[in-house]
A protein has these predicted regions:
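Pre-Walker A (Motif I) flank of P-loop NTPase domains
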Residues: 2-6
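P-loop (Walker A) phosphate-binding loop of NTP-binding proteins
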Residues: 12
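Conserved lysine of the Walker
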Residues: 17
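Hydrophobic positions on the alpha1 helix immediately C-terminal to the Walker A/P-loop
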Residues: 20
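NTP-dependent small-molecule kinase module
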Residues: 25, 148-213
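ATP-dependent small-molecule kinase phosphotransfer cores
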Residues: 33-131
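A glycine- and Lys/Arg-enriched "phosphate-lid" helix/loop adjacent to the NTP-binding pocket
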Residues: 106-179
Length: 213
């Protein structure tokens, strides 16, 4: 099933994943390559998602909907299955470059280290709901940052009218996530980029990594 190329940019909220995915897409398209962007667990832009994944995303992001970490894992897994079957796999089969803001590494960080779910169970469910190809991207890059830098970046967005389930968590939880992403990158020997740099510099480093992958 190799055909296309699957590239994932990971990192905590506020590290600039979506911006960098869009810049990479522009870079590849200028070079005549077909690109499919996806956003996990869904997106306001249906070209980057599916209706079912978006409905699951609404439940996931609903901060007033009480649920267990186990339910969060199942909701994310269901959204991934939908994205894999309807967006990612078809695009790869057509030879496209798939650029994703997040994949299951976010669940390893958020639900694994953040909410205490065993990582082996997360991996088992991800494999059950998706595919080996999904679990092994051609390139997976982690944008890392410290707590203070992340807070400053998010503050530039302005006040959130309706913070979601995870945006509303306290500083201790957010710091756990920052550390989780750095630890996962080390564990899986993944390239990292300091998200505290300028957008232009981050993009340049991403291009350099993707070129040699």
């Amino acid at each position: 099933m190799k055909k296309g190329k699957y590239i994932v940019i990971e990192g905590n909220d506020g590290t600039g994943k979506t911006t960098q995915v869009e810049l990479l897409a522009e870079h590849f398209r200028k070079n005549g390559q077909a690109v499919q962007i996806v956003e996990e667990p869904g997106s306001d832009n249906l070209t980057n998602s599916t209706p079912v994944a978006n409905e699951l995303r609404k439940a996931i992001k609903n901060g007033s909907l009480e649920r267990s970490p186990e339910i969060n894992v199942l909701l994310f897994s269901a959204a991934r299955r939908e994205l894999w079957q309807k967006k990612i796999a078809p695009a790869l089969n057509k030879g496209k470059i798939v650029l994703s803001a997040r994949n299951y590494f976010s669940t390893l960080a958020y639900q694994g280290q953040g909410e205490g779910i065993d990582s082996a169970e997360i991996l088992r469910l991800t494999k059950l709901f998706t595919h080996e190809r999904y679990m092994n991207p051609d390139v997976l890059i982690v944008l890392v940052t410290n707590h203070d830098t992340r807070k400053k970046r998010i503050a530039k967005r302005g006040a959130l009218l309706n913070p979601d389930t995870f945006e509303s968590r306290n500083d201790a939880f957010q710091n756990t996530l920052n550390n989780a992403y750095a630890e996962l990158a080390t564990k899986y020997n993944l390239p990292t980029i300091d998200a505290g740099q300028s957008i232009k510099e981050i993009h340049k480093q991403l291009i350099d990594i993707v070129k040699v992958a």
